């Protein structure tokens, strides 16, 4: 939780505090989860359409709704984190995203799934600016460069692995269950991040 995050670093630091690297792993796990949520669903769209008898418009909103709410929340959530503390907003974002992933995985209609995707976008909009801000807050100098290098790697891998993981989950669960697994997989990552 937010109270478990170490205090922000002073401008000059000896770089020996290992807690900041644990914080980075938590940040990267959450950002990985939220960005994978964009790409993993792409391969599940046909299964979703069939299972929920969704229209083409419903399918478009599954993708667009997430991006829309993510974009709307992103800047204001980042500013709120700057003013009121990043840790709490980060954990709020992870909680929102995780709960919305449960709702998406259990959705019985296209409308329910779209609502869950809108809410996932809100959660992701909270997670991402706080993660970047906390990297800047906890790391200095060359260590900041390394931390952002890990961040960039997590972003790239999450987007690349999403379709592969989505295909695997659909193959594993079939058309009726596999698409649900593409959302429920985020619950595991979210719970580990919150823990």
Name what the model sees in each region.
Residues 2-195:
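Transmembrane-helix bundle of Major Facilitator Superfamily
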């Amino acid at each position: 939780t937010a109270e478990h995050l170490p205090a922000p670093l002073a401008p000059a630091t000896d770089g020996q505090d290992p807690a900041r690297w644990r914080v980075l792993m938590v940040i990267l796990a959450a950002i990985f989860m939220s960005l994978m949520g964009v790409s993993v669903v792409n391969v599940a769209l046909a299964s979703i359409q069939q299972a929920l008898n969704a229209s083409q418009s419903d399918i478009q909103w599954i993708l667009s709704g997430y991006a829309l709410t993510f974009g709307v929340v992103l800047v204001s959530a980042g500013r709120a984190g700057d003013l009121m503390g990043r840790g709490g907003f980060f954990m709020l974002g992870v909680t929102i995203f995780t709960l919305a992933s449960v709702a998406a995985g259990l959705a019985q209609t296209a409308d329910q799934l779209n609502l869950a995707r809108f809410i996932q976008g809100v959660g992701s909009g909270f997670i991402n600016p706080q993660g970047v801000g906390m990297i800047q807050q906890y790391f200095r100098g060359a260590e900041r460069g390394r931390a952002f290098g890990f961040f960039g790697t997590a972003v790239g891998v999450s987007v690349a692995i999403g379709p592969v993981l989505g295909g695997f989950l659909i193959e594993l669960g079939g058309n009726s269950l596999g698409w649900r697994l593409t959302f429920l997989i985020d619950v595991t990552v979210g719970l580990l991040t919150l823990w």
